[in-house]
Each structure stands twice: as structure tokens, then as C-alpha cells.
Amino acid sequence: MPNTARFITPVDDPGSAPVLFRRVRPDRGHGAITSARLTVSARGVVEAWIDGEPVSPDVLTPGWTSYEFRIRTVTHDVTRLVGDDVVVALVIGNGWYRGHLGWMGNSALYGDELAGWAELRIVFEDGHEQVVGTDDSWSATGSGILEDDLYDGQTIDARLRPDLAALTDGEPVRVVDVDPALLVESEGPAIRRQELRRPEKIWQAPSGATLVDFGQNFVGWVKVRVQGPAGSTVTVRYAEVLEHEELATRPLRNAKATDRFVLSGGVDEFEPTFTFHGFRYAEVTGWPEGSPLSEDDITGVVVHNDLRRIGHFRSSNELLNQLHANVVWGLRGNFLGVPTDCPQRDERLGWTGDLAVFVPTATFLYDTKDFLSEWLRDLALEQAHLGGTVPVIVPDPLKGVDIGFPPLDATAIWGDAAVWVPWALWEAYGDVAVLSRQFDSMTAHGRRIRDLLSPSGVWDAGFQFGDWLDPTAPPEEPWNSKADNGVVATACAYRTAGMIAGAARALGRQDEAVEFDTMAASLRSAFTREYVEPDGRIHSDAPTAYALAIAFGLLDGTARQQAGDRLTEIMAASGHHISTGFAGTPFITEALSSTGHVADAYRLLLQTECPSWLYPVTMGATTVWERWDSMLPDGSINPGEMTSFNHYALGAVADWIHSVVGGLSPLEPGYARVLIAPMPGGDLTSAETTLDSPHGRISVSWRLDGGDLVVHADLPSEVEGLVRLPGRDDVVVPGGSHVFTAPMSNLVLG
């Protein structure tokens, strides 16, 4: 039966969060109800209720898509809620559709008119089906939500909240003209509350405000239980860090990150579910006198897409364990709606470059297949809209907005997300369908790169982000890196062409495989000719240049070893401090360890002085920072405009932690065949890595025992392992439990 529901909106816009409702009486004479399903959508975000009960635990439904091209619908089984006579209510928030988006202060970039859509299908025991959809017979009323914005927060007046089970009269609605072909069923996991956190500390700041520390930087909101004078307001502000003993809001830039709760005079419970904040600390003002805020009054609510954790790592080094935990929390906070760069300031956008470098880590830690596959649909649609150029933000709400960059064509890393992300999904989960669906997008990006190459065969023209946020770059010039942009872009283009050729072979597309193998070979030759000196040095002599050339396979034999040796010299000269940005950081430890410099890779990984991965850990970080020095050693905040304390890109090193420190990596897509090759180093005496692969749980653990390295491996029955230990011949093992030893004399410990 075709749907007849239409998008509707109040005739008179209330300004914020209208309730759209209708009373539904099931048809008589058809026996008992056997099933009832409610499908909802919105231009905005929607919470659906039946007789005052939420239909699901989902929040911020239906998430964020490229609204010009598709709008998600979400279906819920509501059989238990549909009785003789019920009120179906939709509360509509601004969300990503009408709220603020981007750092330029813009709002309503998709449109200034909220709209809700719903279809209730009731099936009776005689087979009769009753369908009730949104149309102009519905009504509208207020919700008690006076303001709602993802960046700025939410204001709720408890005195104005309606009883959603008792709605009768309301204001008229009108139908909004939306092409029904835009509606698509959601494929990915919903956004949901994941965890409740009690405060670890509540105290008074010098300003007199009450501060709450939840002990972890996370994303979501607080819910509050309070009783006070009617009309009085409790205000909650949020931030990731403190500075000068007060809430540090400067890094939020223009995001107000403020929730306000207007009290009714009775016992009120508030939960601002039409916004989200990135925070560890909350500042509370206006709390009723005579009853100080306690741990029972305020709760942190962790919110993100409902992803299943599949990968774990733990070692004997607690600082390294905390770094890994920080990477996990960074993913949790930024996989909300779409994979974002940061969750707290006036940005929170789907920057493609951040995900491109982080995706191997993401696919190991969580089952991200459906979440990222759906995001890739929007990438392909946005790319097609631009004639083959991959935008740097997906979804891209900033079309036509001056964002301070020149008009962008294809860019290395950021544009490469069109290829690197589906490739990583295939490697992690073994489902070739994602390659098939994204193949046109992948090849379009590769061909656009080819069109932009210079006559010399390298990619050295046009705007590039380069090694973004190189720690030696000035705070206000994050693009000003040591590594030459042409070196970075050409190396990435080679990697991209090789992946497209590999995807073509996996799909049986021989013509495209030859096309992109040829492109890769040409890029490799041009890279060597234009950028590699006779003594093995690479143009710009920067760590990122060597890391990419080695990790991407641009060098062979002597040249490769020369590059690894030179990289080691540079790292030693820097005191083994990290000196790479977005481009080089994910690959520098791999470049060192794969050229025989495992000890130097560990010295880099375990460095605690700034800049380093562990410096933020020593400063109390519980997520990965945007900058190596987002907080300076004296506790002050980096003066740069971009200073996020929850930015997962630099946490991409976790991929190397899993594969080299932990010793587990795939040899075939979906971990059908795996490499077991831990390389101990530093002060580590043990480590354990586990993965719930498509074939079952894989576990690799090792410990130093006397004079031996002892490795335990557990493989599912259908998974084959290749065991590679220092000083030992490779061994192929079937599924099952295995123990191996190697003399410690074969190890080079850092």
C-alpha cells in the first residue's frame, strides 16, 4: 500500500519545537491488533510519542543527511502502545536542518521551515490494514521548549509542557511540499543514550558558580532533578576543560553550549534532548537556595550512535592504556549523526580528512559498517553534485557560504575519503558490496586527481591542506607544515590509485584495474623522479614525507631503507617528539617499525613531553586533542582559534597499536586470514588485543617471561593465522588456540 503521509508544519510557526499531533482510533470490527508500526521523519529532528510514552529510546531522529538529496525515515514497532484510542504526537526540533551549522554563524542553511512526517500502520487479525499519515487534519501546539539549537543549547519551561497523552484542541497545520522520492529508510544505527555518569566532584568556583566534574570528556547533556520557585531559572553551561579555576569556554568559539530550565514550582525533571554538548565540566547557576546541588540532582548522559564495540587493547603500560581509552572516547563523541571533527564548538561537521586517516582505527574498535556505509551514500551524492569533486565536508551544508577557503577542487586525504573509507570497510568486514556501491564515486575521485596532475606527473598545484596541524606550524597557520604539499598529495594519490585498482580487481572490473594500476605506476615513477634525491633524501626532508613514502610503498630496497634511516635520524634529533600533522601522524610509527626501527617507534609512542601522544595523558586528558598542545604545560589553553579537546584524527596511531604492539592485523578482507606479529618494545612487558571479527573472536596476547617472548593466539575455526616472530620462520596455523615462544635476544627493545 503506497504511503499517503505528507510533511506538515504549523500554520503559525511557534519559533521552536512544535508538537504535531492527532488522536487515532483503530478501526472496529477487524479483531485484535496484531501489529502496529510507526514510521517517522522530519525536516529537523523528531521525538515520537503515543499516549505520552516515547516510541523508542532513539534521540535526534532521523539524524543528519544531505537533505537536498535524501531524508531518512525510521520505523518503530509500537504494537504495545496502540490501544483503543491514542494520541500520536511528534515533537520537532531544529536539529541540523534549521539550527546553526558551521563556524560562520549561519543557521537554517537547509531551510527555515521545520516539518514532521509520520505514518502509522495498524494490522488486525483478519488482515485489515489501517494507515494514518500526517496531513492537514493534524493539529499543532507548543512543547514547552522555548529554544533549541545543537550548538547553543536548549531552554525548557516546565510550566508550559503539555500532557502528550491528553492533547485535544490545537492550532492548524499545513502540508509542506516535499518530494516523497527523497524519503529513504535509515540503514545505520540510531543515536541513543549510551551511559549515565555520576559527578565525581561538585564545588564552588571563585566566581561563585557551582562546578561539576564528570571525570570524563564526553558528548551528550545533563539531566537535572530540581524543585524551586515557579518561574526561576537554572542555567547549565558546558566545557571540556577549566582555566584559571573557571569554566573554559573560549575554545567553543561562538557555540553558547548553555541549557536553561525554567521551574514549575513542583519537582521538575529536565533533559535537553534537542541539543548536545562536548564536555567534562558543567557550570550550574540559579540553583534554588537552601538545597545545594548534590550528586543525586544531576547526571551526565552519554549520547552517540548505537555502535557495537568489537575491538579492545590493553598493555602493561597504564599511560598507553589511557591513550587508547582516549581514542575510544574520541570516537564515541564524534560518531554522532555523522563522523565529525569535533563535538563541542561551532563546527561539529563531517570533515572528510579526519575520517580518512582514522577509519582503520574506527573499524577495529567498533562495528561501523552500517554507520559509515550510510555516510558514504551522502558523500557520493554530494560528489556527484559537484561533478566528481569530493567536498571536504559531508553532508555539505556550506554550499554557497564563504568559509574562508578558495573554491576547492579535489584535495589529498580529504577527497581521498571517497576511496580510503570504503576500502577500510572492505578490509575490516569483508563485504565487497560497499566497494560495488561506491565504485563510481571512487573512480570519479581518482580520475579527477589524474586531471589535476602537472605535466611532470606529480600533484603539486591547487589548494591542499597538506600535513594539517603540523606542531611546528604557527597556531593561526595550521596549513603551514614542513612537508611539501606536492610530496604529500602525490603520495596520497598513489595510494588512492592503488586502492581503486584493488577494488576493481575485487569486483572483476579488469578494465578499471588496468587503468588505475597504470595511474599508480605513473605516479610512483613521477614521485621518485621529482622528489627523491640520489642519496635517498625526499624533497622537504620532513618526517611526514618519509612516513608516507615508506608506508604507501613508494620506495623499494635501498631507497626504502635509506628513507627509514633518515626518518630515524630526524626523530632522534627531535628527542623523539612527534613532529607530524594529520597526514603523517597515522603512518610514522609504521614507517619506523617496518624499516627495522621498532625501538624508535616505541620511543616516539611513549614520549611524555610535549609534543607527543602521551603528553595530553600526563595533563589529565580523557580524549584525544586537536593539537598536540591544546593545553600548554602551565595549564593555559593554546591561543589558536582551533583548540578542540576531542578530535580523534591524531588518535589514528591506535591502528599501529593494534597491529604492531598488539600484533593483530588482517591479511585478507574481513580477517579471514590474519597476521600475528607482535613487536614488543619500550617498557612494555605484556599486551593483549581482541577483535570480534565477522568470523568470531580473535585474541592475541604476549608477555615477556624470563628470557622469552610468549605469545598466545586464539582463532575462530575458519580463520587461518600467519605467525611472524623475531628470529623465527613464519608459521601458518589453523583456527584454535596456539602458544609460541621466541628468545628475547631476537628483540630490539626501545
Regions found by a protein language model. Name each.
Residues 108, 112-119, 132-165, 177, ...:
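Non-catalytic C-terminal accessory modules of carbohydrate-active enzymes
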Residues 1-345, 353, 370-373, 387-395, ...:
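Extracellular/oxidizing-compartment recognition motifs
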Residues 135-137, 141, 292-326, 332-333, ...:
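Active-site acid/base region of carbohydrate-active enzymes
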Residues 88, 155-157, 346-352, 357, ...:
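C-terminal capping/lid segments that line or modulate ligand- or cofactor-binding pockets
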Residues 36-40, 220-240, 271-274, 284-287, ...:
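Alpha-helical support elements that line or immediately flank enzyme active sites
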Residues 57-68, 244-256, 369-475, 612-635:
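Helix-terminus loop motifs that line ligand-binding clefts
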